[in-house]
Swiss-Prot record:
Cystine pairings recorded for this chain: none
Active site: 52 (nucleophile)
Species assigned in the record: Rickettsia rickettsii (strain Sheila Smith)
EC class: isomerase
HAMAP family linked: TruA
Domain of life: Bacteria
GO molecular function: RNA binding; tRNA pseudouridine(38-40) synthase activity
Function field: Formation of pseudouridine at positions 38, 39 and 40 in the anticodon stem and loop of transfer RNAs.
Name the record gives this protein: tRNA pseudouridine synthase A
Pfam families in the cross-refs: PseudoU_synth_1
Binding site for substrate: 111
Length: 245
């Protein structure tokens, strides 16, 4: 068997997320069907990040196995040909060791969350960022973010449907940068809880609106209660950037 590692980008707006689900179109299903069309093999694709409906990716990593060797550049061309009806594309493919696993071999995952912060919406960024019309206090958000760095119990920031065995996660990066009318939040960790990034963003926006003081983020973290945190930020602003191995 030959194991292939591919890097994928997609717009999640019209898709049901990464994971295959009955009755809806997912990124996993689109790619698995494309691979079957040129290889004749039914494969199972394993992804580094199981993104939700509406979430985008610029560097999602996945792997699959084929019984016969195909040149990586031909795989890229073939997949991109058969996924053309959808906003999904592969921009890298390489052979990987048989013990490589896109999900379990990853040592870190990186996300960006985009906020358009101006009085009027951005047509160009429709469904690609969270538009917030009122000015956000970025220094206050940065101050609040510092409380979340490191190893913590992130129960307050996990979805009620989260299936992770433990709420303990280590947030290694949470940087907030304002560039003109756009605010970007950069987050990285070995792994994340379901909705963790979006719940963190929703809570930091309450700080940015001066509804909460920066110090309240520490109280929310210590509460270990989802009801203590802010709303879940829209999926449209979230991007899976890359996985490190």
């Amino acid at each position: 068997m030959y194991r292939y590692k591919i890097t994928i980008e997609y717009l999640g707006t019209d898709l049901a997320g990464w994971q295959r689900q009955a009755g809806v179109m997912s990124v996993q299903q689109i790619l698995e069907e494309a691979i079957y069309k040129f290889s004749g093999e039914q494969v199972i694709l394993f992804g580094a990040g199981r993104t939700d409906a509406g979430v985008h990716a610029v560097g999602q990593v996945a792997h699959f196995d084929l019984s016969k060797y195909l040149e990586p550049h031909k795989i890229i061309t073939a997949i991109n040909y058969f996924v053309r009806p959808y906003a999904v594309g592969v921009w890298n493919c390489e052979l990987a060791p048989n013990n490589f696993h896109a999900r379990f071999s990853a040592t870190s995952r990186y996300y960006i969350y985009r906020i358009i912060n101006r009085p009027y919406p951005s047509v160009i960024d429709l469904n690609r960022a969270w538009w917030i019309s009122s000015p956000l206090d970025v220094p206050a958000m940065q101050q609040a973010a510092a409380y979340l760095l490191g190893k913590h119990d992130f129960t307050s920031f996990r979805a009620s449907s989260c299936q992770s065995k433990s709420p303990i996660k280590t947030l290694t990066e949470l940087n907030i940068i304002k560039e003109d009318e756009e605010i970007k939040l950069y987050l990285s960790a070995p792994s994340f809880l379901h909705h963790m990034v979006r719940n963190i963003v929703g809570s930091l926006v309450l700080v940015g609106k001066n509804i909460w003081q920066a110090e309240q983020i520490k109280d929310v973290l210590e509460a270990k209660d989802r009801k203590a945190a802010g709303p879940t930020a829209p999926a449209s602003g979230l991007y899976f950037v890359k996985a490190a191995y």
